[in-house]
Regions:
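C-terminal regions of proteins
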Residues: 234, 239-295
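Membrane-embedded segments
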Residues: 28, 33-120
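A general structural motif
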Residues: 23, 72-76, 214-216, 251
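Short beta-alpha junction loops
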Residues: 81-85, 223-226, 260
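Well-ordered, non-membrane alpha-helical segments in soluble/globular domains
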Residues: 61-64, 196-204, 234-244
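Secreted/periplasmic serine-hydrolase-like ester/acetyl group-modifying domain
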Residues: 94-209, 213
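Active-site segments of SGNH/GDSL-like serine hydrolases
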Residues: 207-232
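N-terminal secretory targeting modules
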Residues: 1-25, 70-72
Length: 295
């Protein structure tokens, strides 16, 4: 429920008091796609992976605003771009609870229901019915996915071809339900169009923050397996991914690996149809650093 209870992933006040490291070369932001795309362990670079599963763009922005002090001048901020980064998502109590244990000053990472989240974090017995239901759903998901939690640590794909095909269909079906999409090639619904406008401005704010503080923002589109990528039609990609970045209207380097067959066609670099496994993350991270010219 709470992220970074050991204060090792994010440089909050506890981390800063326990570590002397500063002048980091790079941080990456993002949701699940970023969390399972980058792994800097064993690489001669000072970098942090600030992505979480899940994590909104607003939370990305606020994490950067709170913790950017560890970056060196000219440091890179990798912004992971996923299929629906350009659409807004509803947040709830569990989103606010994720960051309730952070030791930060100023605005919270997730302002929505922040005071409630703080109260519940301190006094769980006060959980209301709504919060208790959310907690039960969360814990049930954790209980039934012990094997799933181990999968990202594998260096191979535990799924066979048929399982990968079914997994890809589940992702597509889930996204359609989450964002109210019937046809992925159709125009945006009014609700998604409004969410797009919000996300455009939010991304502009994030990019502008980077440039104003002397950092180098970079869009990164990680690869997915062919089992999932085949559902991303040119119309879909233009409308939901590239069109969104164009509408943001900022001059930002784009590293796009969605068509890189070295990753896309090798199922054994993933732990499902979507996310890179331990070996895949290592290879992908080295590739990104090489393309940035910093490793």
């Amino acid at each position: 429920m709470f992220v970074d209870l050991a204060h090792e992933t994010y440089p909050d006040k506890v981390w800063l008091g326990a570590h002397e490291e500063r002048d980091f070369d790079l941080v990456n932001l993002g949701s699940s796609g970023g969390k399972w795309a980058f792994d800097y362990t064993g690489i001669d670079i000072k970098a942090m992976n600030w992505a979480q599963q899940p994590q909104t763009l607003l939370e990305d922005y606020n994490l950067l605003r709170h913790f950017h002090c560890i970056l060196k001048p000219g440091g890179y901020v990798l912004i992971t771009i996923m299929p629906f980064t350009g659409l807004n998502k509803n947040t709830g109590l569990m989103d606010a609870m994720k960051y309730a244990k952070f030791d930060v000053q100023g605005d919270p990472i997730q302002p929505y229901m922040f005071e409630e989240a703080q109260r519940y974090a301190a006094y769980p017995i006060l959980f209301k019915k709504q919060a208790l239901k959310a907690l039960i759903r969360y814990l049930m998901g954790k209980d039934k996915s012990c094997d799933t939690e181990r999968r990202p640590l594998l260096d191979h794909n535990p799924m066979d071809v048929n399982e990968l095909e079914r997994d890809a269909k589940r992702w597509i079906s889930g996204w359609k339900k989450q964002f109210g999409i019937d046809d992925m090639d159709a125009a945006l619904t009014e609700e998604n169009r409004q969410g797009r406008e919000y996300r455009i401005q939010l991304m502009r704010n994030l990019i502008d923050f980077c440039t104003e503080h002397g950092y180098k923002p970079v869009y990164v589109i990680p690869p997915v397996t062919e089992h999932l990528a085949k559902y991303y039609t040119p119309q879909f990609e233009e409308r939901y991914i590239y069109g969104y970045l164009k509408d943001v209207g900022r001059d930002v380097m784009l590293l796009d690996y969605s068509k890189d067959d070295r990753f896309r066609l090798d199922d054994n670099l993933y732990f499902n149809s979507f996310f890179l496994n331990k070996r895949g993350r290592k290879l992908f991270t080295k590739r990104v650093l090489k393309d940035l010219g910093i490793h």
